[in-house]
Amino acid sequence: CINLREVKLPKSLYTICEETFYGCESLESITLPDVVNIGESAFAHCISLKNIVIPESVEFGIDDSAFLNCTSLQKVTVNGNIQQIGSAVFMNCENLKSINIPKSVESIGNDVFEFCDNVTIKCYENSYAHEYAKTNGINYSLIFDEREFGDINNDGKVDVNDVTHLQRY
């Protein structure tokens, strides 16, 4: 698939299997449907791929080496309920600058960001991704949950209970 530049996959697709787009050197853009898993090396060596959005439907995870050596990849947005990011998923994505990782991630494999010297992980405080970034010396930026200004008791609304709670202090 040397000349493949763009792919729009059908909504009926359930999973992206192992090595599906392996080595598609000209692939710049892909729209992922509501798949539940991205297989091992599914996009490995897609050296022209610049951005990827992992849909909310991906629950199980991103398997090992899924985006290995995608050297033009700059930004990854991971949405939803993903549970695991396999080993070496973004290894040698040397231009990767930003990836957001949701709270739902419970496991991140070895060498995921090896040779990604400029990456910043956007993560939630005290999440698995936050601890992973700190432990592995990876730059990170914290994402804060949106709260309404004045919501002292964090129940999602501003009311008299917030005033009562504030008066205690």
Regions inferred by a protein language model and the residue ranges of each:
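Phosphate-coordinating loops and pocket residues in cytosolic domains that bind phosphorylated ligands
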Residues: 54, 135, 168
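Low-complexity, Pro/Thr/Ser/Gly/Ala-rich linker/spacer regions in secreted
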Residues: 137-151
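Consensus positions within tandem repeat domains that build extended binding/scaffold surfaces
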Residues: 17-22, 39-42, 63-66, 86-89, ...
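Short, aromatic/basic amphipathic alpha-helical patches
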Residues: 128-137
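Structural signature of tandem-repeat unit edges
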Residues: 1-15, 25-37, 47-61, 70-84, ...
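Alpha-helical segments with a strong preference for the paired helices of cellulosomal dockerin domains
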Residues: 152-169
